[in-house]
Every structure is written in structure tokens, then in C-alpha cells.
Amino acid sequence: MVGRKGDATVGDATVEPRDTIEIVNVVASTGIGHEINLKQATLALEGADYDPKRFPGLVYRTKNPKTAALLFRSGKIVCTGAKSIDDVYRGLENVFQSLRNIGIDVKGTPEIKVQNIVASADLHAVLNLNAIAIGLGLENIEYEPEQFPGLVYRLSEPKVVVLLFGSGKLVVTGGRVPEDAANAVDRIVKELKSLSLLR
């Protein structure tokens, strides 16, 4: 199969950059509305890790789905490591149930707020980051190759940060819904094509 101009071709299939998007981490926050005795919780929760000299929260890992919950004395909980929003909800429900099982009051299902979705994608093209930095405008770009090999591009719509690498790989961070990554990739492709920096 012959791809249209601008498409990357892998074997017989034409792959659009938006089709390469993979969510690599979802971070969400919640809370149970009251303080948690972290020392007692550490003793009761199997696999919990709490070392207040290193980190002020208790780290509790769930296995299915594989996530890490950071529990704080205030009752706030941050879930990280999930690969989807569904995994965040399932992972936190496991945490809530584990807390209930050791006698900590968790009423109903606390509100869960997605804070950050990190996704990766591939433009299937080698990128000239110097030309991109100039073409996209230095006011939205950070590019210091001696400090970091990627170009940092801050988008206002969607409000995300995109890291572009010379290999054509990119990372989108700061999204609140999965569509933010897709919209960011579409926008990057459109802008780079308009500057003749991507075919």
C-alpha cells in the first residue's frame, strides 16, 4: 500500500502520527476527607512503604492494575503509574477498599481528579530541531541542546507541553483527557507541515 504524501509507512500499513499515541502515565488525586495515621497504615497494609525522612507520604502499590498510590497524613491521595483513566479509577478503588479493610473510614467513592496525562507518539521522521525552534517562534520554545536533547514546546490549546526529539519521537505532558494528546499531535503535525519541516 502506498501512503499519502506526509504519511509514514510501516510495512504494508500507513501509520498516522496520532495512531502511534500511547499513554505512559496518568496521575490523579483524591482524598478521604480526614487524616490518616501513616505509621499504623504502614503496619497494616501489605507492601506499604513509609520512610518520612525520605518522603512525607506512604507509598502503596496495587498490582492489578499496576499503580502506586501516595497517601499523605492529611488524607490526600495521589495515584501514579496508571496507563489509562480506567486504571486510575480501578487502582484507587483498590486503595479505598484496602483502607476500609484495615478500619480506615472511606465513605462512598471519593471524587477523583485527573491531574496529568503523559503520552508518547512518533512522527516517523527525523526532525531538525534548530529549524523547528526558529519556525515555531522562540516565545513558546525552550531548546538548549547542551542541556537537554529535546525541544520543549508549550501549547496554549490544548494546554500541554510537548517534548520533540530529533528522532521524531515526542512526549505530550499536562493533558487532562486523552484527547489532549491527540489534539496536540495533530497540531504539531499541521504546524510542522505548514513550515515544510515535516512531509
Question: What residues fall within each predicted segment?
Answer:
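Intrinsically disordered, low-complexity polar/charged tails and linkers
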Residues: 1-161, 167-169, 175-199
